[in-house]
Curated annotation (Swiss-Prot):
It holds the Pfam family CRT-like. It is a multi-pass membrane protein. This is Chloroquine resistance transporter. GO terms for biological process: amino acid transport. The chain crosses the membrane at residues 58-78, 90-110, 125-145, 154-174, 180-200, 209-229, 247-267, 317-337, 346-366, 377-397. Residues 1-57, 111-124, 175-179, 230-246, 338-345, 398-424 are cytoplasmic. Keywords: Amino-acid transport, Disulfide bond, Glycoprotein, Membrane, Transmembrane, Transmembrane helix, Transport, Vacuole. InterPro entries: CRT-like (IPR013936), Transprt_Chloroquine (IPR017258). Can function as a drug transporter. Can transport chloroquine, primaquine and amodiaquine. Coiled coil: none annotated. Changing residue 384 to F: Increases amodiaquine transport with no significant effect on chloroquine transport. The gene is CRT.
Length: 424
């Protein structure tokens, strides 16, 4: 029996991975930064890291830009649609759900069925689809009530609270773990928007109620659970995005009916609808949307009990809104599938300042064009700075996971060598 310092035949030779060499170089750079080095060297190292981050994730950043453009157009066209046919919300909601269902099912049968996973092919996801639809419906209904006495500035701030709410539930249910920079980045985004919206609140005299503000905040909870359910279905069962959106749209045709009794609530002001008038409202809504016929033209307008109809060409605005909303749903599902609920939450929060800036351009906003405000750019800067800090936290966590994986591989290699050095 002899002792040889060599491995068994067939055992793969373990060589350092290029990724870990790069990580070692990063670690050396970090140790250099901690020493007395010129400011220019620190800036150069930071710019190099930023360049590598953008180069390695260029597709992600392009997707974010596309998603941002789609979101801005979706929100602008939603407001234009509301201005034209705001008296018939139920009709527009149900018609939009039907359009989404037809489009998603058509796309699924043309492209989606060819790439079905084995788990998706042998499992029925009706319960998960229904759960997502019910959670979305609950979120819409609760938000519908909260929005009635929540001013526009407070609405914008409440939407940003989805960041800490999603972080909490993802930590609790999906077992996410965060770096300190994740918390700091999220905190910067929320505080920046809170300060700006607090300053803007002094410029408005609209009615606002703290109780309804809390109701609006509560609507973010079912929305968070809906997104987490999507993430679980996507990542655990590899379900097709088109199939999920198609079936969810089908269920939403029925869950939207849950909103009908909400229109009878007396505090809904201009959109209040007595129960006895629901049938007439639905009929007039179809006439407005498809025939362009105005019904409510007298005793209506700003400060009155009803909005005035502006049905001419309403179907064009509505179709454009439906198109961008469908694109929004597809990109949202793709981000949640490929990345995570928190990635989508952080990305979606840029909508607020981006939409505010979009209202500066008449060709986008139409009659709702606004004058530029410095506070909107401050909000955008705060969001971008907070997002960069949040992303740095993710990079650090990814680096730690890679280092741990490298250590595990090295320890396995040492055990293999120890077993193989004793040979005959």
């Amino acid at each position: 029996m002899t002792i040889l310092k060599k491995k068994k035949k067939g055992s793969p030779q373990i060589t350092p991975d290029e990724r870990y060499r790069e990580l070692d170089s990063h670690a050396q750079n970090e140790s250099e930064i901690q020493e007395d080095v010129p400011i220019s060297r620190k800036i150069a190292n930071f710019l190099k890291l930023a360049y590598n981050e953008i180069r390695e994730n260029i597709s992600i950043y392009l997707l974010i830009i596309v998603y941002l453009c789609v979101c801005v157009m979706n929100k602008l066209l939603a407001k234009r649609t509301l201005k034209k046919i705001g008296n018939y919300s139920f009709v527009t909601s149900e018609t939009h759900n039907c359009i989404c269902m037809v489009v998603f099912f058509a796309l699924y049968f043309m492209f989606g069925r060819r790439v079905m996973s084995a788990k998706e092919r042998h499992r029925n996801f009706g319960v998960q689809f229904l759960l997502i639809s019910l959670l979305d419906a609950c979120s819409v209904i609760i938000a519908f009530i909260g929005l009635t006495r929540t001013t526009g500035n407070i609405q914008s701030f409440v939407m940003q609270l989805s960041i800490p709410i999603n972080m909490f539930f993802c930590f609790l249910i999906l077992r996410y773990r965060y770096h300190l920079f994740n918390y700091v980045g999220a905190f910067i985004i929320v505080v920046t928007i809170a300060v700006v919206e607090f300053m803007l609140s002094f410029e408005t005299q609209e009615e606002n109620s703290i109780v309804f503000n809390l109701v609006l905040i509560a609507s973010l909870i079912p929305l968070s659970f809906s997104n987490m359910t999507r993430e679980i279905v996507f990542k655990k069962y590899k379900i097709n995005i088109l199939r999920l959106n198609a079936v969810v749209s089908f269920f939403q045709i029925f869950t939207s009916c849950l909103m009908l009794p909400m229109y009878t609530l007396p505090f809904l002001k201009q959109i209040n609808l007595p129960f006895s008038e629901i049938g007439t409202n639905i009929k007039n809504g179809f006439r407005c949307l498809f025939l362009g016929q105005n019904t409510i033209v007298e005793n209506c307008g700003l400060g009155m009990s009803k909005m005035c109809d502006d049905c001419e060409g309403a179907w064009k605005t509505f179709i454009a809104y439906s198109f961008f909303n469908i694109c929004d749903n597809l990109i949202t599902s793709f981000i949640i599938e490929k990345f995570s609920t928190m990635t989508y939450t952080i990305v979606s929060c840029i909508q607020g300042p981006a939409i505010a800036i979009a209202y500066y351009f008449k060709f986008l906003a139409g009659d709702a064009v606004m004058q530029p405000r410095m506070l909107d750019f401050v909000t955008l800067f705060g969001y971008l700075f907070g997002s960069i800090i949040y992303r740095i936290g993710n990079i650090i966590l990814e680096k730690k996971r890679m280092m741990e994986a490298g250590n595990d591989d090295d320890s396995e290699g040492e055990l293999t060598n120890a077993d193989s050095i004793i040979t005959h």
